[in-house]
A protein has these predicted regions:
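Glycine-enriched alpha-helix->loop->beta-strand junction motifs that scaffold or abut catalytic
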Residues: 1, 17-24, 42-49, 69-75
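Catalytic beta/alpha-barrel core
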Residues: 1-9, 21-32, 53
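Acidic-enriched, low-complexity/disordered segments with a strong bias for Aspartate over Glutamate
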Residues: 4, 9-12, 28, 45, ...
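Active-site-adjacent beta->alpha loops and helix N-cap segments on the catalytic face
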Residues: 10-12, 31-42, 61
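Short, glycine/charged-enriched secondary-structure capping and boundary segments
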Residues: 16-18, 38-40, 66-67, 90-91
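Flexible C-terminal active-site loop/helix
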Residues: 55-107
Length: 107
């Protein structure tokens, strides 16, 4: 069982321990990359698995989540794939693999 809206940042983490086996971290909910990384570390320390997801966004919005996804058990960063047109340059997806953002997208 994975907490999604029940765990937005570290303030919500204590109520999830014992109720869930995992949390879904989204940068939009956490307030940015710094809190998302801190939440992931705290969740691991509490024995919870990590999923990193995203809202509908361009590649620029998903690029920092690529960092938070390192070490996550599940990753769902398909937001740019749901757009009719993404920005250029865009994150490259091939056969289910997401490649690191190009430096021109997110230094």
């Amino acid at each position: 069982l994975c907490a999604d809206e029940s765990c937005q940042d570290r303030a919500d983490l204590a109520q999830c321990v014992g109720r869930y086996q995992a949390i879904n971290i989204k940068l939009d909910k956490a307030g940015g990359l710094t809190e998302a990384l801190a939440l992931a570390a705290a969740a691991r320390d509490a024995g919870l698995e990590i999923m990193v997801g995203c809202m509908l966004s361009t590649s620029l919005g998903v690029a920092p989540a690529f960092l938070a996804a390192q070490g996550a058990r599940w990753v769902d960063l398909d937001g740019p794939l749901l757009l009719a047109r993404d920005r250029d340059p865009a994150i490259r997806f091939e056969k289910g693999t997401m490649y690191p953002p190009p430096s021109a997208l997110w230094g």
